Amino acid sequence: MTVLSDMKCEACQADAPKVTDEELAELVRMIPDWSVQVRDGIMQLERVYKFKNFKLAMAFTNKLAELAEEEFHHPGIFTEWGKVTVTWWSHSIKGLHRNDFIMAAKTDQLLG
């Protein structure tokens, strides 16, 4: 079984395929703490991380920023006291690509 967090993102162009319904069902099982949201017709992955204070939430946000730069794939991040909401989707295809699931798994690893 492939471990998503061990995979690397690939360049995603505007003509890249979105995940199929079958792929979505398989991939979402690999990141059980994430939910699929649809905003403005665009499918996205979202998770809320809880922290004891703002400083810890900000430290996590900074780690996530470094990861996003390394993989050249960038999430929506909303940081507030004790909480960080992370949203992954592929802007170029206006939906979900395998990269988003890889990055969700890598984001989860930042907690460890």
Swiss-Prot record:
Give the InterPro entries listed for this entry: PCD_sf, Pterin-4-alpha-carb_dehyd, Pterin_deHydtase
Which molecular-function annotation in GO is an example for this chain? 4-alpha-hydroxytetrahydrobiopterin dehydratase activity
Give the catalysed reaction(s), semicolon-separated.
Answer: (4aS,6R)-4a-hydroxy-L-erythro-5,6,7,8-tetrahydrobiopterin = (6R)-L-erythro-6,7-dihydrobiopterin + H2O
Q: Which domain of life is it from?
A: Bacteria
Name the enzyme group at the top EC level: lyase
State the UniProt keywords alphabetically: Lyase
Give the EC number: 4.2.1.96
Please provide the Gene Ontology terms (biological process) for this protein: tetrahydrobiopterin biosynthetic process
The record's similarity note reads:
Belongs to the pterin-4-alpha-carbinolamine dehydratase family.
Q: Output the HAMAP family linked to this UniProt entry.
A: Pterin_4_alpha (MF_00434)
NCBIfam families the UniProt entry points to: PRK00823.1-1 (NF002016)
Query: Under which name does UniProt file this protein?
Result: Putative pterin-4-alpha-carbinolamine dehydratase
Q: Give the source species.
A: Shewanella sp. (strain W3-18-1)
